[in-house]
């Protein structure tokens, strides 16, 4: 990876550009079909986490890119309560309160597949429900609506992902945190169980923290 960031004869990339370049490599490996009993190597998530360590820190642009990349990768590491998707059906990702992440996610997933399924990004507005979603990302701008959106995602069997200090407390399955200026994520297994979601051990192995009870 370092050869990509600082190849001989090339000017070293700035941290944000270096991070985005590294993410492109991490995203190149498609996510494999996920079952809790899978033993096949699934390096995509680990590569994505390691990509940030090649950069000095996260600018707003880089932070947005990393979060979008994680959201894309999360889809391939979760068994949803409805079972495998029908052939030709897309994964649907809803985004509330984070227009910048929605735009970046749409860009990153354009033409890409997860388990042979396309990814559709849906921007949610006030009053929109979570029905039909597989993942709901709730931006920090939602504030007081966070808990209600998390509850709606749980009822719909969708993976909830937040980015606030109260995300796990509000019942979110995954919450983004900044650690030493790098985007990491924490997981609530209790919340996943309430939403009838099974998370791959590969995903859990690269989480910053895993809460096993409560939350």
Walk through the language-model features, giving the residues of each.
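Short hydrophobic alpha-helices and adjacent helix-cap/hinge residues
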Residues: 2-215
């Amino acid at each position: 990876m370092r050869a990509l960031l600082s190849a001989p004869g090339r000017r070293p990339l700035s941290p944000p550009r270096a991070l985005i370049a590294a993410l492109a490599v991490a995203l190149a490996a498609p996510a494999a079909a996920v079952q809790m009993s899978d033993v096949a190597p699934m390096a995509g998530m680990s590569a994505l986490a390691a990509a940030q360590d090649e950069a000095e820190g996260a600018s707003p642009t880089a932070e947005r890119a990393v979060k979008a990349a994680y959201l894309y990768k999360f889809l391939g590491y979760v068994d949803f309560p409805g079972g495998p998707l029908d052939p030709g059906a897309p994964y649907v990702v809803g985004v509330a309160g984070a227009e910048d992440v929605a735009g970046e996610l749409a860009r990153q997933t354009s033409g890409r597949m997860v388990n042979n399924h396309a990814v559709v990004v849906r921007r949610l507005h006030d009053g929109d429900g979570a029905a039909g979603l597989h993942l709901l990302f709730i931006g920090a701008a939602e504030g007081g609506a966070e808990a209600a959106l998390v509850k709606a995602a749980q009822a719909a069997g969708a993976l909830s992902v937040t980015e606030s200090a109260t995300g796990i407390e509000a019942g979110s399955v995954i919450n983004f945190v900044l650690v030493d200026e790098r985007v990491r994520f924490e997981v609530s297994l209790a919340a996943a169980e309430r939403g009838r979601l099974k998370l791959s051990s590969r995903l859990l192995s690269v989480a910053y923290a895993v809460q096993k009870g409560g939350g």
